């Protein structure tokens, strides 16, 4: 039973510093319907609403929140923890806070339990001789995981896939808050919910269940560490894994059992302890291990205790050593590469970039583009100048009119941009959204480029070189050497087109290219070539790069097609539905099938169709982002988005309004003329003439008179 300590929490009542997300850009969830049909959905919409941090004013606190649909998560202070959830019967940012407690859950004593003794233990003798080093030597690392939820846990958590998914995200989010001292982040690569039935046999013994799950993992999730979250009402242990071997592909799985009545916070601690043991940490020795708080994370007491928990000095030393062992699953963070701290922004007049406190920047004194308008020494506008630099600033020192081209299209995935009539600088670059077909349906647009292997080979080796056949790619990328690999290992069959770039070599001479070595292979009718760019391969990879984002031009680029509706991403072949978010922009629904979605998730319309919804309007085209003027139909009037109404449409509008008005006035004038002639004739005959106005006036007088009586 949740004990409310505060029934209402306003959104501005909690100050929180939020940090990075932990859902990968290609993360996906899998569920099963009543017919046992599997459905997949991208988690990209949840990527930027799951965060970790702390309560402002309470440095020794921890917060893990998801704000995707209301505020959900956990808040920890020194010795107490609270859960927070939205009140579904109330509207607005109103939430319930309750203290996290375990409802008489029977949790095995990890201090005495030998769950892991059936596996080979690591040799930890190095710790006694290891010199303690400063915490600053640790650098950010991440572990990618595939999470699986069994049928019983799905039912225990409410039998609602949306709610269960949110709870899984909460668990991983809370784990990341505890791992923050180790600078370690657990990333969610996928979440599979066995909502219909379990996909494997469930033996009673956890170690036997682990063997069953490993077979499933090797078949369906071979790339990353896999975790099975399973419900057992009264388990004999907390789970199963191979201690210290989790980073080895053959042993890369773990089972975490969820007892009845356990809080989500306590279960998160169980999952964290299992993961820590899996990478090589051990339980703490109470006599020699110490932590900043009352409870250390790698102790049995941590599962029962509320409040902030921390890794001990023993765990820190162990992890420092493990981080030097080039464990395959401990990778450098791809989204937060170690960069130099950005220097304080300062103005540099003459660099051609408009910066703070500058009115203009036309370049150096010698190369100033607008000498009549801008002083290149002070970056100030000259007298009477409206602008002094920029693509849309004319030599007359005035902003160019709307519809003037300011940036040409580079390729079929890139769009033209126009001056909007208001700004001296061209609008931001617009291009087709990632995943849009190009090259007659043979490739995909990615980051504004049409990603074809032909173009990549031509850019690397010259205009006569083309991309190789699948047979060449398969031959080279299965070699598992520096000329054929997927960075850290050989490419599996399905990823063959996403590793090293393989091209056809049409020449009879050998390649002579600085800092490049080449391997050749005659495969069927083609002479194929693969390149290696200088340097000695790292210990943990088959290249000179440890991070996917740093790989050189001898690797296939992200976005390259690798099958029907498939694209390469970080040397893996993925389905395009994980790349494209159709909820934000859909060409059929939003663009009327007469345009494509751009990088702002707005429609870029074909010629003859008007943005934003690509409705048929003669002469219109483009998007609301490219700077050109377009029209929005409001009722019966057309209103221009940027600057006034087009002269041609102004004339049409004038005619539409004035012609009916002239006709009405003419009709009234003709009617009055006829009445005047009729009255003139009747007066000459001595009869009275009563017009509509006179009748109306007579009635009004009579009514007023009767009112006075």
From Swiss-Prot:
Gene3D superfamilies: Collagenase (Catalytic Domain), Disintegrin domain. Residues 141-334 form the Peptidase M12B domain. Detected in testis. It is a single-pass membrane protein. Residues 671-709 are cytoplasmic. One of its GO terms (molecular function) is metalloendopeptidase activity. Residues 346-434 form the Disintegrin domain. Its main location: membrane. One of its GO terms (cellular component) is plasma membrane. One of its GO terms (biological process) is male gonad development. Pfam families: ADAM_CR, Disintegrin, Reprolysin. SMART domains: ACR, DISIN. Interacts with TEX101. This is Disintegrin and metalloproteinase domain-containing protein 5. It comes from Rattus norvegicus.
């Amino acid at each position: 039973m949740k004990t409310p300590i505060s029934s209402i929490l306003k959104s501005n009542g909690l100050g929180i510093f939020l940090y990075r997300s932990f859902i990968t850009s290609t993360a996906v969830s899998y569920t099963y319907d009543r017919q046992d049909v599997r459905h997949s959905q991208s988690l990209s919409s949840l990527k930027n609403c799951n965060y970790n941090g702390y309560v402002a004013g309470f440095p020794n606190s921890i917060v893990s929140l998801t704000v995707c649909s209301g505020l959900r998560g956990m808040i920890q202070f020194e010795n107490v923890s609270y859960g927070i959830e939205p009140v579904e019967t109330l509207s607005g940012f109103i939430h319930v806070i309750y203290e996290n407690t375990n409802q008489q859950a029977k949790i095995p004593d990890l201090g005495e339990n030998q769950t892991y003794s059936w596996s080979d233990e690591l040799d930890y003798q190095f710790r006694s001789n290891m010199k303690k080093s400063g915490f600053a030597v640790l650098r950010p690392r991440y572990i990618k995981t595939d999470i699986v939820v069994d049928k019983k846990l799905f039912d225990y958590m409410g039998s609602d896939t949306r709610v269960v998914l949110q709870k899984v995200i909460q668990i991983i989010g809370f784990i990341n808050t505890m791992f923050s001292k180790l600078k370690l982040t657990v990333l969610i690569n996928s979440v599979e919910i066995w909502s219909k039935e379990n996909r494997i046999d469930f033996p009673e013994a956890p170690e036997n269940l682990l063997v069953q799950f490993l077979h499933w993992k090797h078949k369906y999730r071979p790339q990353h560490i896999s975790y099975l979250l399973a419900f057992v009402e009264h388990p004999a242990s907390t789970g199963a894994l191979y201690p210290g071997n989790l980073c080895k592909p053959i042993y890369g799985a773990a089972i975490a059992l969820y007892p009845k009545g356990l809080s989500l916070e306590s279960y998160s601690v169980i999952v964290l302890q299992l993961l820590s043991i899996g990478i090589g940490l051990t339980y703490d020795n109470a006599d020699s291990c110490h932590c900043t708080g009352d409870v250390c994370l790698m102790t049995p007491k941590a599962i029962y205790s509320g409040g902030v928990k921390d890794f001990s000095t023993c765990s820190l030393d162990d992890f420092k050593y493990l981080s030097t062992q080039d464990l395959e699953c401990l990778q450098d963070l791809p989204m937060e590469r170690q960069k130099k701290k950005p220097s304080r922004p300062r103005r540099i007049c003459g660099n051609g970039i408009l910066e703070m406190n500058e009115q203009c920047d036309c370049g150096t004194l010698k190369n100033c583009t607008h000498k009549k308008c801008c002083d290149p020494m002070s970056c100030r506008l000259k007298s009477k100048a409206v602008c002094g630099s920029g693509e849309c600033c004319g030599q007359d020192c005035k902003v160019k009119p709307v519809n003037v081209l300011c940036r040409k299209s580079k390729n079929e995935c890139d769009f033209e941009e126009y001056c909007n009539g208001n700004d001296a600088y061209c609008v931001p670059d617009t291009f087709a959204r990632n995943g849009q077909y190009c090259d007659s349906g043979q490739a995909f647009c990615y980051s504004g480029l049409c990603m074809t292997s032909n173009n990549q080979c031509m850019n690397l080796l010259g205009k006569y070189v083309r991309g190789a056949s699948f047979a060449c790619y398969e031959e080279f990328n299965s070699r598992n050497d520096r000329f054929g690999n997927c960075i850290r290992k050989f490419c599996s069959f399905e990823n063959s087109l996403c590793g090293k770039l393989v091209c056809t070599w049409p020449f009879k001479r050998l390649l002579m290219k600085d800092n490049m070595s080449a391997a050749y292979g005659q495969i069927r009718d083609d002479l194929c070539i693969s390149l290696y760019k200088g340097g000695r391969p790292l210990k943990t990879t088959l290249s000179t790069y440890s991070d996917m984002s740093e790989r050189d031009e001898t690797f296939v680029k992200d976005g390259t097609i690798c099958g029907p509706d498939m694209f390469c991403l970080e040397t893996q072949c993925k389905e395009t539905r994980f790349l494209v978010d159709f909820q934000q922009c859909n060409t059929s629904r939003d663009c009327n099938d007469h345009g494509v979605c751009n990088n702002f998730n707005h429609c870029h319309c074909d010629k003859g169709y008007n943005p934003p919804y690509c409705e048929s309007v003669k002469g219109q085209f483009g998007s609301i982002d490219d700077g050109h003027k377009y029209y929005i139909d409001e009722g019966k009037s057309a209103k221009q988005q940027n600057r006034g109404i087009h002269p041609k449409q102004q004339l049409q509008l004038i005619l539409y309004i004035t012609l009916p008005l002239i006709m009405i006035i003419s009709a009234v004038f003709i009617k009055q003329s006829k009445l005047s002639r009729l009255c003139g004739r009747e007066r000459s005959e001595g009869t009275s003439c009563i017009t509509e106005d006179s009748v109306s006036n007579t009635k009004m007088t009579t009514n007023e008179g009767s009112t006075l009586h």
